[in-house]
Design a protein with these regions (language model features):
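Short alpha-helical catalytic segment bearing the HExxH-like zincin motif
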Residues: 31-36
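Active-site rim/loop-helix segments in enzyme catalytic domains that contact anionic ligands
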Residues: 39
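Histidine-centered, transition-metal-coordinating active-site segments
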Residues: 1-30, 42-199
Length: 199
C-alpha cells in the first residue's frame, strides 16, 4: 500500500508541475518520503491494535515518533518530510496530498481494497482524479471538469464502508480479534506464558 501511495504521489507531483505549479525537487522528495512513511506506525491488524495493545496513542503518533527516530539517524534528512506530515509547511497542498480528503493514501487503499475484496463498486479512477487536481492559494483544488470523478470517488468510498469496512462479518471478526488481544494482554500481565507461533 505504501508503495502504491508513493506511486500515486509521484503521478500527482508530475501532474501538478505540468500545470505550472512550482514544486522544488526537495519538496517532491520530502512529500514522497512522507507518503512512503505515513503508515509506518500501523502494526498488524491495522486499527485494532490502537484499541487494545497500545492505548491512547494513534498510529499517526507512532508514525511520527518513528519518522523522528529515523530522521535522527539520517541527521535531519527527513526534516522537510516531517514538516509536511505535521502540516507545518507553508505549501498546505503538500500535506493535503498526504492527509486530506483526496489524499494519495485514500486513492490507493480504495482501489487496492476494491481489488482484493472483489467489490467492483469501490473501483475509482485515481488517474483521472489526479489529473483533475490543481493548486490555488497553496491549497489543493479540483478542476470543475473533475466534479463527476470526485462524486464517483465519494460514492465508491461510501459503498466500500457499507459493503466491506462496516460489513457485519468484518465487524464481528474485528470484535473477536479485539477480545482475543485484550485477553492475551490480561494473561501476559498476570505472568502467564502464552504460546506464539515462531512464524
Amino acid at each position: 500500500h505504501s508503495l502504491g501511495a508513493f506511486h500515486l504521489m509521484s503521478e500527482a507531483i508530475t501532474s501538478l508541475r505540468s500545470k505550472g505549479n512550482f514544486i522544488f525537487d526537495s519538496e517532491a522528495e520530502a512529500v514522497q518520503a512522507a507518503i512512503l512513511l505515513h503508515d509506518i506506525g500501523h502494526g498488524p491488524f491495522s486499527h485494532v491494535l490502537e484499541h487494545t495493545i497500545v492505548n491512547g496513542v494513534s498510529h499517526e503518533e507512532i508514525s511520527l515518533m518513528l519518522m523522528e527516530r529515523i530522521n535522527k539517524d539520517l541527521k535531519g534528512q527527513l526534516n522537510l518530510a516531517i514538516q509536511i506530515f505535521k502540516d507545518e509547511y507553508p505549501k498546505k497542498f503538500l500535506h493535503q496530498l498526504v492527509s486530506g480528503q483526496l489524499d494519495m493514501d485514500r486513492l490507493d487503499y480504495l482501489r487496492r481494497d476494491c481489488f482484493y475484496t472483489g467489490v467492483s463498486e469501490g473501483n475509482i479512477g485515481s488517474a483521472r482524479i489526479i489529473k483533475m487536481l490543481d493548486v490555488k492559494d497553496d491549497h489543493l483544488v479540483v478542476e470543475s471538469k473533475g466534479i463527476y470523478s470526485i462524486e464517483n470517488f465519494l460514492t465508491s468510498r461510501r459503498l466500500m464502508y457499507w459493503q466491506v469496512y462496516l460489513h457485519k462479518t468484518s465487524v464481528a471478526c474485528e470484535k473477536m480479534l479485539i477480545s482475543t488481544l485484550l485477553r492475551a494482554k490480561e494473561l501476559a500481565s498476570q505472568g502467564v506464558e502464552l504460546f506464539a507461533s515462531p512464524a
